[in-house]
Amino acid sequence: MNILEMQKVNEIVNTFTQVCQDCFLTGSYRFNRASKDSDIDIAFPIMAKAPLIEYLAKINVTELEHSHYNAGVKFHLATVDQTINAVFLHPLDFVCWYIAANMLNASNVPLNNMARHDFHALHQIMISLPKMMIRDCVTSTNYKEFMSDMKNGQKI
């Protein structure tokens, strides 16, 4: 596979935003670390899993398989010859991943030059910070309140 242009990646994410409303790009494409072997990682709240699976049954995807990573699914999008990794998260984790991704993007840390294990350690620390602050507050009905800059879809 080739590394996709960010415009194309965002078009793909926007397609899923129209289906499931709340999702955002995460992983190597989000953090400017994509290689020719990279999947497009998209995070969703767990409530979006059934609607997404239903949608995938209607479009041209191949190699649909369940992933043990956060109740996810992995599939190949034939139209762009790219594998998509859909990650489904509890609303609290969804909010924390979103906040952590924004924090990492806003930091001055050269993420694309970090070793994989160093990046993953930093990512886990960033996810833990908001989780410590809001862990007793986030539910499946109010999680959007904690993502005030996500207006009807994705913000990168």
Predicted regions located by residue number:
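Catalytic core of pol beta-like nucleotidyltransferases
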Residues: 1-37, 44-156
